[in-house]
Amino acid sequence: TEAFRVDPAATAAFSALRSALPNLRPLDEDARALKAVVIGGGTGAPVSIRTLLSLGVQTSAVVAMADDGGSTGILREEADVTPPGDVRKCIAAMAADPNDPLTKAFKYRFSFARNHTLGNLMLSALEDAAGSFPEAIAICEKLVDAQGHVYPSTLDHVVLSAQTQDGRILDGQAVACHSKTALAQVWLSAEDGRPPRPYEPALQAIREADLIVLGPGSLFTSIIPNLLIPGVVEAIRASRGRVLFVCALADVQGETWGLTAREHFEALTAHGMEGLIDYMLVHSKVPLRAESPATGSFAAISGAELEHASTSDLNDDQLIKGVRPISISYADMLAIQSRGPIVISRNLVDAEQPTWHSPFALRDAFQNVIKLSRARRS
């Protein structure tokens, strides 16, 4: 019924991918033995999780813990729990059967109950009943028969702060992600003011990974907050794994409003990832050639202007409706590659949901990255 809504997470697209799996070319045995870790938040990370699982890769996720909006924000404020929302989404993405009734119920959102999801309530209740958030995660992973593990990057209750490109300071993830101008930098602090402590199993998963995937998802409020936890960047550096950054298709919020793909890359390097990114996957409807900027195929339907621009003159209603494709030019591609990464450009847009990655295109791109990684290592 309408009272029980499944939380959206590209469910239909990845159901189609699951149905097509018997007819898709699998990875060889060596590739399926690879360990991958996805670093991100609750919207983009599940996309990479489902894609990697469809390839048979052993997959874990390290998840940002700065969420303070919506259902999670209410639970944090009123029950002082560890933020469950992004972890819940990644657990659901790990489920062996997305159509299992328990897995579907785990994603139900109740509009009549302050928009809480069952999964959020379960994680928060189990954190109290079992005595720890990691134990709550482990119980929920068993309930949905998760095919991998989800690790919070920290167990500390952290607050994200941001500085916009026009110099304003914003406190809170929910505020920062809807900024009216692009963000310049972000930082974390624990609620008692000290630096947050890393969750050691998350660091270990990163160190053991053969492939580390950043994104897709919100750059400053989902991906980078993980990198701000002491020890995470060092774990990436210590890993023998290749690092893939999956750039978002579009900015449908405000935090990266008007930023190009090159500026997304530069934001990562400014937050500790200089020299650590091996591959960058970007959307390009057409092959990148000299002096030919590429944009999302949804530019026409969004009406978005593609030049670098500020949105300080937009009101909230305009900001909410805006969808700005993330563009990349041939010159930007060369500039990125001059700093180390191989840029892989593909048409990645899902025709049915133009602001989502096509699971089939993403799967094919991931296969190629795995092959490239093995070739470079041998």
PLM regions and their residue ranges:
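C-terminal functional extensions of proteins
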Residues: 3-18, 258-378
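Active-site gating loop/helix substructures
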Residues: 156-220
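Short glycine/serine/threonine-rich phosphate/pyrophosphate-binding segments
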Residues: 43-49, 221-228
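A short helix->loop->beta-strand "cap" motif at the edges of active sites that frequently abuts
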Residues: 57, 239-243, 340-341
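Gly/lys/ser-thr-rich phosphate-binding loops in alpha/beta enzymes
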Residues: 17-85
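Short internal beta-strands
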Residues: 60-66, 241-249, 278-287
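Charged helix-capping and loop-helix junction motifs
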Residues: 226-233, 259-264
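Electropositive, gly/pro-rich neighborhoods at or near active sites that engage anionic ligands
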Residues: 1-3, 7, 66-182, 365-367, ...
